[in-house]
Amino acid sequence: MAKSSVKEREKKREQLIKRYEKKRKEIKQQIIEASTLKQKWQAYEKLSQLPKDSSPVRQRRRCWLTGRSRGVYRYFGLCRHMVRKMAHEGLLAGVTKSSW
């Protein structure tokens, strides 16, 4: 189980990403459309002024049940431990134990 402070930090990052998403896209478009090197550098400077945590790269995929960051299945949004546990209990629709 992840610490609650780590979970809260991830939520804060998610909010920052949503808040600065439009601004970040506009600045990146300016970088692409810049005709001179000076304009490009100015746009890069604007981009670097934004908060670090507003970049989507800094967000980590976490299990919504436990907060675990490693071994998370995208399809379920759960870590491997919870997928196994819930599958055995029959809580995941369409998941069956394989046998051949």
Curated annotation (Swiss-Prot):
Disulfide bonds: none annotated. GO terms for cellular component: chloroplast; small ribosomal subunit. Its main location: plastid. GO terms for molecular function: rRNA binding; structural constituent of ribosome. Keywords: Chloroplast, Plastid, Ribonucleoprotein, Ribosomal protein, RNA-binding, rRNA-binding. It holds the Pfam family Ribosomal_S14. It comes from the Eukaryota. Gene3D superfamilies: 1.10.287.1480. GO terms for biological process: translation. It is found in: Plastid, Chloroplast. The keyword Isomerase does not apply. The keyword Membrane does not apply. Part of the 30S ribosomal subunit. Binds 16S rRNA, required for the assembly of 30S particles. Belongs to the universal ribosomal protein uS14 family. This is Small ribosomal subunit protein uS14c. It comes from Cyanidioschyzon merolae (strain NIES-3377 / 10D). The lineage of its organism: Eukaryota, Rhodophyta, Bangiophyceae, Cyanidiales, Cyanidiaceae.
